UniProtKB/Swiss-Prot annotation:
Binds ribosomal protein uS19. The gene is rimM. This is Ribosome maturation factor RimM. One of its GO terms (cellular component) is ribosome. Its main location: cytoplasm. GO terms for biological process: ribosomal small subunit biogenesis; rRNA processing. Keywords: Chaperone, Cytoplasm, Ribosome biogenesis, rRNA processing. It comes from Leifsonia xyli subsp. xyli (strain CTCB07). Belongs to the RimM family. GO terms for molecular function: ribosome binding. The PRC barrel domain binds ribosomal protein uS19. It is found in: Cytoplasm. Residues 115-186 form the PRC barrel domain. SUPFAM superfamilies: PRC-barrel domain, Translation proteins.
Amino acid sequence: MADHKLPRKEVAPRPDQTELRVGRLTKAHGLKGAIKLELFTDEPGKRFVPGAVFTLQVPTASKWHGKTLALRELRWYNGHPVGFFDGVDDRTEAESLVKAILWVNQDVRELPDEEDAWYDNQLVGLSAHRDGAVVGAIVRVDHLPGQDLLAIKTPGGEVLVPFVKAIVPEVDLAARTVTLTPPPGLFEDLPDDAPAAGDESEPVSPPVTAEETPGGE
């Protein structure tokens, strides 16, 4: 799984710099501040070296908001990566970091050219097309542990669209458009085909009593 090359929208990197999402802290491990990680990179030996500094994506209410985290050591326990970080010396501190997403600065000139990989600033502002008609525009990209979501502003409000090939089959940076093939109900309410209660056109069968139920006593 390659590094996710979609920096957070709030970060304004230099033209030759971007941020890569490389991991997520998932669970405190032991009593000395160690934390299990979920890796979003094929190169943990390059990204998670002693002294590596990560920008933290955490809620604004977190005491870690706006701070960085420096790695002391990465170990493997039963096939799972576990990180030890400066300033995180007990289980309480480790638990306060659970669900934090780790980002690193990256020189874009060192990134390999890769299809189907875009930066947030390339996607924000693109118009979203469905069946040849414009339905809205991308206003941000939300990065969740399971997948990324495109936040699309429409006349009816904001719609979150899973950024997967089946729903977003085409991104055309030159035309400043994305093509959508959303499932029913994503952009509109599904029709209610169920008959209304008391509708005489759909008679309701009387309730079945215990005596009428096969095997009832």
